[in-house]
Amino acid sequence: MKPVLALWLIAFLPIVAANAQDGPAPPKISDIMAQQQRRHIKLWFAGHSGNWPLADYEIDELKDGFEDVNEQFGGDTVEKAVGAPIAAVEKAIEAKDRAAFTGAFDKLTAGCNSCHRLLDHSFIVIQRPTSLPYSDQSFATQK
């Protein structure tokens, strides 16, 4: 039994060591997109509540997530689908304009769905959030 264990260690230890040196695996696109969906929800409630600093934070986080997707998977599909809508959301946030925010947010959501269709994931349909899943976070502005 001991010789078998020794042979196993000799055979597989270099593989295990090599994998350990590579560092952690990058997140899967499904993990990034799950986080993007949470950011999308928070962005809506922040803008809808007029919490412009939080909305600004969430749109920046969304942009970072989309950059992660582009870095890992290449191409410019995401940029083509959501680049202009993100800019419109940023402009509405800067202007503190709820009506413009709502329209820009809806275009961003449509851009997300357009990207899903382009990547053969049309079964994933994002919409404007209808309820707040974060009962532990206030989206009201701090006075």
Spans of features found by a protein language model:
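Positively charged n-region of N-terminal signal peptides that target proteins for export
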Residues: M1-V4
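Short cysteine/histidine-rich metal-coordination sites, predominantly Zn2+-binding motifs
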Residues: I126-D136
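Sec/Tat signal peptide C-region and signal peptidase I cleavage site
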Residues: I15-Q21
